[in-house]
């Protein structure tokens, strides 16, 4: 993939407005708010009433707001791709009126419903609940089917040749799987909420999945609620299958790393004197780290099992079998168990989050998950939490431009707001990123102007560029874009060289541990440390632990897996070499 000097980039991370989407986020958030309030007002407006005119007014007002919100989403004002190419485009509309109109309609409807809704209409079925639930589920199903068809068409029409190790998760079917899991999780939340409220005011029962015995306190809830509550039970045997597959793969990999040609002893010069216990521990760590490459299949097993459970219960409800009455007691037990599993899972997650305050290791793990979840700009979903990279990338870009002395030509003028302006002695910059930072660092490089690129080098540690992001988001991280990133770092020319191209020595090193379960190689698996010190490969290896031989106290060196890179000697070696190249050619 060639590197261009204009603003028409194929790589979206190079778009000038990729990390500047505050305007689009504001517009989308207002439209989301207006549409949500309109739907809620419609639900209230369809309740039984003795005042038909009130219903007409409420439904008309809510429909107008909903149509406006949906129509506005089709305009370029909320088009994120348009914003990426027009970073400085003025904002004429923020659609705040749509959000305010939706809130006003909802508040007016909710307050007036106290007098307008027919209080004498007693029913054991919540009005409009079943129809609304089925309508939402039908829309979600249609969207899922459309997404599956789209993926199938793309796979059969434009399936590109991908480099080894860059194949998308599940062969490109990850997007439908994630969407399916979102529907299932939303349905489980719906089930827990509806059943919890029903138990407060009576005894819940399905319409076609009746309880063991109906009484005056029986409250009928949609059968879909029971389907989501019971369907989650099938995830338990699926989890057992996943655990078995993980254990089998772990044993196979551990044996392979102990006996094959690419075994542990081949990576350590002193391996002949090393105890078998140390070799076994390293082989175990390598095997654990390799399991990450199978996580997509395992998640798919759980998701499909959950889907089968929900679908089976829903089919039984649609068939309206008379035998369902006989198993009313069993259904009650299954529903209680399913809701209990979901509530227990939520309690465990809350407990894990609380324990992270006292456990640094868990805090790093949860922090890594949070960083991954908040990497993408909020324009991908306007109600998402604040994006860390959206704040970090522009600031780091400005700092790098300032440190290299190129800020007078930078459109942001990063030093213009500083009074007095700082005295900066231009110098080369080595950008180092660890874990999630090793993904943010390439995003920074992609945003740098050409003159600055000539004075920049990149060092990535524990980088998930290929292993996670490249396989999950090939439209943003792919082998071609990794090549483009490498070319960006080698194609820049320094002012002092009179425009001559810098020697293609490479200014990017990606340090890899085989014990790392998150980071991995990008272009090719690295050679054993020592073999690659004299090469110019981007992917280079670091030994973890640094030695197989016991220390002075007889203890084996600890294995750090994904963490504690600060005490690893290999990054220092490669950082020194990158700095040497920068100072030599700039």
Locate the predicted segments by residue.
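Lipolytic serine-hydrolase domain surface
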Residues: 359-394, 454-457, 463-586
């Amino acid at each position: 993939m060639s590197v261009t000097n204009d603003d028409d980039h194929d790589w979206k991370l190079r778009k000038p407005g990729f990390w500047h989407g505050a305007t689009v986020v504001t517009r989308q958030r207002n439209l989301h708010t207006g549409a949500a309030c309109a739907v809620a007002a419609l639900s209230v407006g369809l309740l039984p009433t003795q005042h038909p005119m009130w219903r007409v007014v409420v439904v008309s007002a809510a429909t107008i707001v909903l149509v406006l919100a949906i129509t506005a989403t089709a305009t370029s004002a909320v088009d994120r791709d348009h914003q990426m190419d027009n970073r400085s485009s003025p904002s004429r509309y923020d659609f705040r009126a749509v959000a305010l109109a939706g809130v006003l309609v909802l508040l007016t409807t909710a307050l007036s419903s106290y007098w307008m809704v027919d209080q004498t209409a007693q029913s054991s079925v919540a009005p409009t609940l079943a129809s609304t639930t089925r309508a939402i589920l039908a829309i979600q199903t249609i969207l899922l089917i459309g997404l599956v068809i789209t993926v199938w068409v793309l796979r059969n029409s434009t399936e590109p040749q991908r480099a080894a190790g860059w194949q998308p998760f599940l062969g490109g079917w990850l997007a439908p799987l994630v969407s399916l899991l979102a529907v299932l999780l939303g349905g489980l939340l719906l089930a827990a909420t509806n059943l919890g409220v029903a138990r407060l005011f009576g005894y819940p029962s399905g319409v076609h999945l009746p309880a063991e015995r109906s009484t005056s306190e029986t409250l009928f809830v949609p059968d879909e609620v029971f389907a989501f509550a019971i369907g989650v039970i099938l995830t338990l045997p699926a989890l057992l299958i996943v655990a078995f597959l993980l254990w089998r793969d772990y044993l196979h990999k551990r044996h392979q790393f102990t006996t094959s040609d690419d075994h542990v002893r081949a990576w350590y010069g002193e391996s002949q004197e090393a105890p078998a216990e140390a070799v076994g521990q390293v082989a175990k760590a390598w095997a654990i780290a390799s399991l990450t490459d199978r996580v997509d299949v395992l998640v798919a097993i759980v998701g499909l099992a959950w889907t089968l459970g929900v679908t089976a219960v829903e089919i039984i409800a649609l068939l309206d079998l008379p035998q369902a009455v006989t198993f009313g007691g069993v259904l009650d037990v299954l529903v209680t168990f399913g809701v209990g599993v979901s509530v227990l899972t939520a309690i465990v997650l809350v407990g894990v989050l609380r324990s992270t305050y006292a456990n640094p290791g868990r805090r790093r793990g949860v922090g890594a998950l949070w960083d991954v979840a908040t990497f993408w700009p909020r324009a991908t979903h306007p109600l998402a939490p604040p994006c860390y990279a959206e704040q970090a990338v522009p600031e780091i870009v400005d700092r790098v431009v300032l440190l290299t002395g190129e800020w007078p030509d930078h459109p942001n003028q990063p030093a213009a707001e500083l009074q007095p302006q700082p005295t900066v002695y231009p110098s080369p910059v080595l950008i180092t990123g660890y874990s999630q930072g090793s993904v943010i660092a390439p995003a920074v490089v992609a945003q740098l102007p050409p003159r600055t690129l000539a004075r920049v080098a990149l060092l990535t540690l524990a980088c998930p560029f290929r292993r996670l992001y490249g396989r999950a988001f090939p439209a943003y991280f792919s082998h071609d874009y990794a090549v483009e990133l490498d070319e960006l770092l080698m194609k820049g020319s320094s002012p002092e060289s009179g425009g001559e191209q810098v020697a293609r020595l490479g200014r990017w090193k990606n340090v890899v541990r085989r014990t790392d379960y998150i980071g991995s190689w990008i272009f090719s698996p690295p050679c054993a440390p020592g073999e690659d010190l004299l090469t110019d490969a981007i992917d280079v290896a670091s030994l973890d632990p640094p030695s197989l031989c016991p220390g002075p106290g007889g203890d084996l060196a600890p294995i750090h897996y994904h963490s504690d890179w600060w005490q690893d000697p290999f990054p220092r070696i490669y950082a020194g070499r990158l700095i040497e190249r920068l100072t030599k050619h700039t």
